[in-house]
Amino acid sequence: MEQSNYSVYADFILLGLFSNARFPWLLFALILLVFLTSIASNVVKIILIHIDSRLHTPMYFLLSQLSLRDILYISTIVPKMLVDQVMSQRAISFAGCTAQHFLYLTLAGAEFFLLGLMSYDRYVAICNPLHYPVLMSRKICWLIVAAAWLGGSIDGFLLTPVTMQFPFCASREINHFFCEVPALLKLSCTDTSAYETAMYVCCIMMLLIPFSVISGSYTRILITVYRMSEAEGRGKAVATCSSHMVVVSLFYGAAMYTYVLPHSYHTPEQDKAVSAFYTILTPMLNPLIYSLRNKDVTGALQKVVGRCVSSGKVTTF
């Protein structure tokens, strides 16, 4: 009995992104730079949306919620990863692994649904502009955010208890840099094929539901844009939607590779590389993709920077 308890609740060992990195401090500096850039850029975007009245619209409200989710998402994984890189002590407790596993699933699921519902916002803005204030009222916006978090939480509450109840009586070494589901299941000494099939169906549903909303919304948007007579209106509509489509393609593409494509088609090293892309790089890229081509956001940033420079000059004088 003692051995059984130990096999279930003992600590795990995270092997990391690169198990045998030749320059660990260089890797640490790179990951830290990406982490700080991600946190700073998302915080700046949230502040700009909050203080600039021109950005008090449903679209920017949803973007601020996406930034908040990205901050929580990257903070769930990267700090532990950085500590492991510096201390060379890669152990993570069973409780810590469970918490990380739950938060990762919840936040990832919330992003799937939020990106899907954000396409509905674009559909209403372009296809039904006269009804936009009613169809995207503040109440509707909060319902969209709540629905996204609820969808993600269901994923976390369903999969986490089942994944963590398997007896891990083989090696305790997780060939990953965080407690991701496929890497954890490889440590189980019981047959997990039935659960993996159920998880596969669950992941398909988690992707299919928001992806259906995205496909339907952008099909209607393309039809509406095609019928527009003014070139300026077309350009503005395309520019508004292109950033969202880039983010959707990056996040959904990486998730489909990891959870939908059969595991025989990719190696553990490839899994870690793809996971690093959508857990570390995507939270940094999202604010850049949405902001660089957005005149409202860049204008708000220039306005704030101008105020800071002016106040600095006055103080110095």
UniProtKB/Swiss-Prot annotation:
Glycans are attached at N5. Its main location: membrane. Signal peptide: none annotated. It holds the Pfam family 7tm_4. It is a multi-pass membrane protein. The chain crosses the membrane at residues 23-43, 61-83, 98-118, 140-160, 198-218, 245-265, 272-292. The keyword Nucleotide-binding does not apply. Residues 1-22, 84-97, 161-197, 266-271 are extracellular. Residues 44-60, 119-139, 219-244, 293-317 are cytoplasmic. One of its GO terms (molecular function) is olfactory receptor activity. The keyword Aminoacyl-tRNA synthetase does not apply. It is found in: Cell membrane. GO terms for cellular component: plasma membrane. Keywords: Cell membrane, Disulfide bond, G-protein coupled receptor, Glycoprotein, Membrane, Olfaction, Receptor, Sensory transduction, Transducer, Transmembrane, Transmembrane helix. InterPro entries: GPCR_Rhodpsn, GPCR_Rhodpsn_7TM, Olfact_rcpt. GO terms for biological process: detection of chemical stimulus involved in sensory perception of smell. Belongs to the G-protein coupled receptor 1 family. Odorant receptor. This is Olfactory receptor 2T27. The gene is OR2T27.
